[in-house]
Amino acid sequence: SVGFKAGVKEYKLTYYTPEYETKDTDILAAFRVTPQPGVPPEEAGAAVAAESSTGTWTTVWTDGLTSLDRYKGRCYGIEPVPGEEDQYIAYVAYPLDLFEEGSVTNMFTSIVGNVFGFKALRALRLEDLRIPTAYIKTFQGPPHAIQVERDKLNKYGRPLLGCTIKPKLGLSAKNYGRAVYECLRGGLDFTKDDENVNSQPFMRWRDRFLFCAEALYKAQAETGEIKGHYLNATAGTCEEMIKRAVFARELGVPIVMHDYLTGGFTANTSLAHYCRDNGLLLHIHRAMHAVIDRQKNHGMHFRVLAKALRLSGGDHXHAGTVVGKLXGERDITLGFVDLLRDDFIDKDRSRGIYFTQDWVSLPGVLPVRSGGIHVWHMPALTEIFGDDAVLQFGGGTLGHPWGNAPGAVANRVALEACVKARNEGRDLAVEGNEIIREASKWSPELAAACEGWKAIRFNFKAVDTLDKPSS
């Protein structure tokens, strides 16, 4: 018969192409696919490729008006997940023309926007993305870079120290500023607004900005060191967010902060551009990440969110600790720490990295470690993460029995002792506790902290683990 032949056909006929050779300009994705019973893995992988690119559930006559071969996503490989029944890694290649330049928002809308509710799948997780260099070059990326930040702050050869002010909600602006001053005076480099401190009735943003600026200038004058406080510019509208960043710049402070997932990628990229143009560092908090990345079989791994943040822009990003109260397995965590900091990262499945990633000189991001860490963790943190990290002790500073400033002193002394010992060639993994004990002999503040936290443990198994073959 004459005319157009409609009807439903299997996705794999069009979108499963195991013979396809990926191009340097393709965006590559690794999905963990759990098909519904009876759905072959090839069909499930092809369905993901189709529904996240050009496909729909039926053949449509307008398919004939374009070159689907040029624009379609392709599932080019399927492999079973070791040790898991009915789970597969599906590799999908997307042509670069499907994505708007310089837009993380558009990239995610395409790749993960719709397909996760697809009925043929029981669950779906985006494990990793390979961002091609041609696409990276359309992004500004982080406002400054690790070396530029060190030059701005005049701090070299050690991790930076921070502290989140607690209680996170309820303090007046003046008392909040006082807590900031005590911590900075004691020896910290930074203090931090909590992620949910925006502009509430008990403390409006402008009052907080003013008292925090006063605190850090007073601490700078007394210590002779450059200090910063992460002023949270996150707001209900982009215009209000930029207004807060402008006020921070007018106060002359070095750094502002944004909650990039709750605030959204469009807002975050706008703020990153403002920060580069106006010499502000940008601290990024990942509030809401566990809603997206916590489940092992569904959602999106944090390494993808970390790559997206590096494209969108931020000078610091929270990235798990390996020790402390927030989950993070060592190899996996170090994998996405490298993705934040380094210029070139090789494929390494033992660390969860599915693709080689070349950042072509896009500035790096300082990973921030926080959550249930204290002075006894300092040797491990210094050894695991090296110099290019921010170590953030909230309760581990403010919970000191003598107060905020002594808590800050204890952390700074512990850090300096660990860095000195490491530079002398001592093994922090073996001698860490001894190094801290030695330092505490001439620092009563550190001795009190050691006594206070000697029994604190967070003994839970990590949720985010590597796949291992069943024995």
Curated annotation (Swiss-Prot):
It comes from Chiococca alba (West Indian milkberry). Mg(2+) binds at residues 192, 194-195. InterPro entries: RuBisCO, RuBisCo_large_chain_AS, RuBisCO_lsu_C, RuBisCO_lsu_C_sf, RuBisCO_lsu_fd_N, RuBisCO_lsu_N_sf, RuBisCO_lsuI. Heterohexadecamer of 8 large chains and 8 small chains; disulfide-linked. The disulfide link is formed within the large subunit homodimers. It is found in: Plastid, Chloroplast. The lineage of its organism: Eukaryota, Viridiplantae, Streptophyta, Embryophyta, Tracheophyta. Its cofactor is Mg(2+). Substrate binds at residues 114, 164, 168, 286, 318, 370. The record marks 325 as: Transition state stabilizer. This is Ribulose bisphosphate carboxylase large chain. CDD domains: RuBisCO_large_I. GO terms for cellular component: chloroplast. The modification N6-carboxylysine is found at residue 192. It catalyses: 2 (2R)-3-phosphoglycerate + 2 H(+) = D-ribulose 1,5-bisphosphate + CO2 + H2O; D-ribulose 1,5-bisphosphate + O2 = 2-phosphoglycolate + (2R)-3-phosphoglycerate + 2 H(+). The active site is at 166 (proton acceptor), 285 (proton acceptor). It comes from the Eukaryota. One of its GO terms (molecular function) is ribulose-bisphosphate carboxylase activity. RuBisCO catalyzes two reactions: the carboxylation of D-ribulose 1,5-bisphosphate, the primary event in carbon dioxide fixation, as well as the oxidative fragmentation of the pentose substrate in the photorespiration process. Both reactions occur simultaneously and in competition at the same active site. Its EC number is 4.1.1.39.
